[in-house]
């Protein structure tokens, strides 16, 4: 089962929502008759913690901190786009905790997710964990970001990442198309079909 867990809570929320259409942009395209690609399921675990020394941080503050991580990603190459896709899913659901003069945001995504690839050579089979922590300033505000991810290959097929991205609050939170969100997170070489996202 796919669930998002709020920071400091044992209660999760399930995926809900309707699909939405997308249009081609850059190196992405939409084709109705594309092959399904090679599916690979993973048991995914992603933990995100953000701390900002500001009593009332904005979504822009969080976005700028995440953008800095996107540009400095230095983890496993084949795992990069998968982790970024999970980050896109998780950030809109981060919970908030006020502590003195700063705010802590956090969340945990856990579940079986299926990704589709245009070639078996693109399927990550090793170096499937990633962890980083960043201390920096955003608009003069001391900021901290911690990301931990682990993907374990599974013979079982879970919910496709395309369905998750379309069924969650992604479009509403980012107020943009899926292609533009991918561009923002520097997720390249992707084909978007009516019901799939294929990593090329």
From Swiss-Prot:
Keyword check for Membrane: yes
Acetylation listed as a keyword: no
Membrane topology, record value: Peripheral membrane protein
Keyword annotations from UniProtKB, A to Z: Host membrane, Host nucleus, Host-virus interaction, Membrane, Viral budding, Viral budding via the host ESCRT complexes, Viral matrix protein, Viral release from host cell, Virion
UniProt GO BP: viral budding via host ESCRT complex
Cystine pairings recorded for this chain: none
Molecular function GO terms recorded: structural constituent of virion
Cellular location(s): Virion membrane; Host endomembrane system; Host nucleus membrane
Main subcellular location: virion
GO cellular component: host cell nuclear membrane; membrane; virion membrane
Function: Plays a major role in assembly and budding of virion, by recruiting cellular partners of the ESCRT complexes that play a key role in releasing the budding particle from the host membrane. Condensates the ribonucleocapsid core during virus assembly.
Subunit structure: Homomultimer. Interacts with viral nucleocapsid.
Protein name as it appears in the record: Matrix protein
Source species taxonomy: Viruses, Riboviria, Orthornavirae, Negarnaviricota, Haploviricotina
């Amino acid at each position: 089962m796919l669930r998002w867990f709020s920071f400091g809570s044992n209660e999760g929320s399930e995926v809900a929502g309707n699909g939405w259409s997308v249009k081609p942009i850059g190196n992405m395209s939409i084709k109705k008759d594309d092959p399904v690609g090679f599916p690979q399921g993973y048991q995914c675990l992603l933990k995100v913690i953000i701390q900002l020394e500001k009593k009332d941080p904005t979504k822009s503050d969080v976005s700028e901190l995440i953008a800095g991580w996107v540009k400095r990603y230095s983890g496993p190459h084949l795992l990069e786009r998968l982790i970024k896709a999970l980050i896109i899913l998780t950030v809109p659901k981060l919970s908030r905790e006020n502590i003195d003069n700063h705010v802590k945001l956090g969340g945990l995504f856990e579940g079986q997710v299926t990704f589709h690839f245009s070639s078996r050579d693109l399927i990550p089979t090793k170096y499937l964990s990633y962890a980083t922590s960043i201390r920096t300033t955003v608009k003069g505000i001391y900021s901290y970001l911690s990301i931990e991810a682990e993907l374990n290959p599974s013979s079982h097929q879970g919910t496709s990442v395309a369905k998750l991205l379309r069924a969650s609050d992604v479009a509403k939170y980012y107020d943009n198309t899926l292609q533009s969100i991918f561009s923002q997170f520097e997720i390249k070489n992707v084909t978007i079909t009516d019901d799939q996202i294929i990593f090329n």
